[in-house]
Amino acid sequence: MREINVSQLTDIIEKLCIDACYHLPCDVKDAIKTCRACEDGEVAKGILDNIIENYEIADADNVPICQDTGMACVFLEIGQDVHFVGGDLREAVDEGVRRGYVNGYLRKSVVRDPVLRGNTGDNTPAVLYTDIVPGDQVKITVGPKGFGSENMSMIRMFKPSHGIEGIKNFILEVVETAGPNPCPPMVVGVGIGGTFDKAALLAKKALMRPLNTSHPDKFYADLEVEMLEKINKLGIGPQGFGGKTTAIGLNIETMPTHIAGMPCAVNINCHATRHKSEVI
């Protein structure tokens, strides 16, 4: 059994919150540059040039990529041979988010009640997900999630008879309905299977996966390529002004489901798809 003091998580989460909001992952930058090279229209190229310039300034000056620094989603993959000591895990995670958003001068966007509102003032609580995995390590991933794109996300409980065409049409419907609202070019996370809640989580986790990776099953890997091509043929384009680049990536995550169902969730993210990880 390996003991880990929760204060280590606090320090790492503080750092990851700041790093994620200041610096886009390399796979996202590469995808944006690749799409820029493929664009024909001057408006679309100009917008992508502005996006590239924006993240280069953020890198150089250590400032947020976007004013919406999101709600902090924290994913912990906890080795089953780990024992946390030194305090409450939930409190340690929130303290890391609190410090990150205060010390990193990141916008505080969380309200304490969904209806009555009232800003918490420090961007807590985090949305915390935990998975138990083999081993004695902990992988920490922080993914700040802006809500211009989150509000465009949808879930649908398909019957098995709808088949793969039902899922394809739904993905296109979600993206087309979103239009310019999620600040395209977007990244599309798709979750298929599980239950109502699990499909949504799969879609969220799909957004954390690097854009230069594929689903391990060839059927879904091919579907990722096919749907990205179809989305980009919609012509929504960068910031909704038209062009070839409506999305820079589409990732699918799947799991088994009930014989009577085929849940599908689509989680939309803007081009500022932010996530950083560290293993202890």
Enumerate the language-model features and the residues they cover.
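Non-transmembrane, aqueous-exposed alpha-helical and coiled segments at domain scale
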Residues: M1-I280
